[in-house]
Amino acid sequence: MRPHSTHTGTGGSAVNKAVAFLVKHPVSGSFFISLSIRTAAAVASNLMIDGVLIPDEGQYLLISRLASEGELTSEFWGGYGRSLFDSTRAFTWPLTALFWLFGPHRILGQLLSATFGAISAAAAASLASRFLRPRFALAAGLTVAIFPSQILWSSVVLRESMIWALLATMALVIAYS
């Protein structure tokens, strides 16, 4: 008998069962692990940093807040504000909608970015599962999920995580067509 056992009484340890579940479901496992890590990073940065972590976040937050309040005019920032909003609308429209619904809170933008980051991890796992065994598909998804730069860029209010999610999804569509 082992001195300390994690045996659950139903045929294996809890860790082994969790790993078996993740290997069986690499796409959803990668998504939820990635989302959990990014959400934790977003919450931590909100608690530890007053303001924004990366200066460009402020631009997206400001133009989306103004747009959600109906105050983003063509005169704002000499026309650049409206131009930036329009040229990044794939990111600023959902952010503006969140601000309109729930108020202009930075965490909403961070959760939007975190979701895009999690989609990237899931897409990587799905793409890998097209060509590799499930264990390797999980490894691909978790690589994206835990890669430090991916965590950073998808836990701040920047459009980069959306771009990676769209690129990964495009690769996935091409692989399955």
Language-model-detected regions and their locations in the chain:
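Extracytosolic helix-loop segments that constitute the early lumenal/periplasmic catalytic or substrate-binding loops
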Residues: 39-47, 56-84, 90
